């Protein structure tokens, strides 16, 4: 058997589509044995973007022996199994797609995805899609907030093609994943950005989604010196796997103020002489601070729950 390095494109029911790095030949891969050489229990042992070592044992089949170290992972917390669920790995950019109209623009979803991107060193870009249908004052105010923080925000439309060329420039020669809630138009965007990628992703989704043209599995596609990864629409984006004491480091607007509080251990909740709190409504948007409080409460509550139920520290 010949050993080689492969990249995972997608996987369904423990069968993976992998592409050999040196030849770009696609194989069907299965994990040899029960588990990979991972250090801890994982919900997603292999995801699109992973690199693996394996043995070719048939013309089109591979035994996957080892997962190589991940440069980064984009994850969310899976409440059903009480574990981090890795969605994609080894990416440069995460395109966070939201809608200017319907479904409703949810800043709470965006804030959580930004936190994971900050934690993992992934460049986040916010796409406000369907702008041809109009942008209300609430959405416009959040666009200004995120731009003020230094995040790149692109207004897009598959109808007028606004912002599409800008997105194409970003993803050129890079590894990029799309993420967003159901109905925000991720698949439609990919369709106008790269038709070949869209068709390939749709074929896989249609085959394994019982005839529905909707993304049900994360799927990677190589095209013109870039890698695009589409992901299923997400209803909830929990980040309970993150420690609540760390949260303040992933809110960009706190970065220059964390050391100006009276106490080094200040969590910016109700401590005296908290400089962060003094900046609410000035350098810090009230909506973002309220988001911080909500997420902080969720993480702290989960910490107590995990300690009681699972004995986790």
Swiss-Prot record:
What binding details are noted for the cofactor? Binds 1 zinc ion per subunit.
Q: Which residues are recorded as binding Zn(2+)?
A: 261, 266, 268, 274
Q: What is its EC number?
A: 3.6.1.-
Q: What class of enzyme is it?
A: hydrolase
Give yes or no: UniProt keyword Disulfide bond. Answer: no
Which ranges form a coiled coil?
Answer: none
Question: Could you tell me the Gene Ontology terms of the biological process aspect for this record?
Answer: ribosomal small subunit biogenesis
Its GO CC terms are:
cytoplasm
Give the CP-type G domain ranges. Answer: 80-237
Localization, UniProt = Cytoplasm
Report if keyword Nucleotide-binding is assigned.
yes
Keywords, A to Z, come to: Cytoplasm, GTP-binding, Hydrolase, Metal-binding, Nucleotide-binding, Ribosome biogenesis, RNA-binding, rRNA-binding, Zinc
Regarding protein family, the annotation reads:
Belongs to the TRAFAC class YlqF/YawG GTPase family. RsgA subfamily.
| UniProt cross-references to NCBIfam families, sorted A to Z | ribosome small subunit-dependent GTPase A
The entry describes its oligomerization and partners as: Monomer. Associates with 30S ribosomal subunit, binds 16S rRNA.
Tell me the protein's name. Small ribosomal subunit biogenesis GTPase RsgA
- The gene for this chain is rsgA
């Amino acid at each position: 058997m010949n050993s080689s390095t492969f990249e995972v494109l997608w996987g369904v029911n423990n069968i993976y589509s992998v592409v050999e790095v040196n030849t770009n030949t696609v194989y069907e891969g299965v994990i040899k044995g029960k588990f990979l050489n991972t250090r801890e229990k994982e919900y997603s042992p292999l995801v699109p973007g992973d690199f693996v070592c394996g043995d070719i044992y048939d013309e089109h089949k591979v035994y996957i022996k080892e997962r190589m170290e991940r440069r980064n992972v984009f994850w969310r917390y899976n409440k059903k199994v009480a574990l981090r669920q890795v969605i994609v790995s080894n990416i440069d950019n995460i395109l966070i797609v939201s809608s200017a109209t319907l479904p409703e623009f949810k800043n709470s979803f965006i804030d959580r995805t930004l936190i994971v991107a900050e934690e993992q060193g992934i460049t986040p870009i916010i796409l406000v899609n369907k702008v041809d249908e109009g942008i209300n004052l609430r959405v416009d105010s959040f666009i200004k907030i995120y731009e003020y923080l230094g995040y790149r925000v692109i207004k897009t439309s598959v109808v007028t093609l606004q912002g599409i060329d800008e997105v194409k420039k970003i993803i050129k020669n890079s590894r990029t994943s799309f993420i967003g809630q159901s109905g925000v138009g991720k698949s439609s965007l990919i369709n106008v950005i790269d038709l070949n990628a869209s068709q390939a992703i749709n074929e896989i989704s249609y085959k394994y989604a019982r005839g529905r043209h909707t993304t049900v599995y994360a799927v990677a596609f190589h095209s013109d010196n870039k890698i695009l990864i589409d992901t299923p629409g997400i209803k909830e984006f929990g980040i309970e796997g993150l420690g609540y004491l760390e949260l303040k480091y992933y809110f960009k607007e706190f970065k220059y103020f964390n050391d100006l509080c009276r106490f080094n251990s200040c969590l910016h909740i109700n401590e005296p002489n908290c400089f962060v709190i003094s900046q609410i409504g000035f350098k810090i948007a009230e909506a973002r601070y309220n988001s911080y409080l909500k997420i902080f409460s969720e993480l702290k509550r989960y910490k107590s729950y995990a300690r009681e139920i699972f004995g986790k520290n």
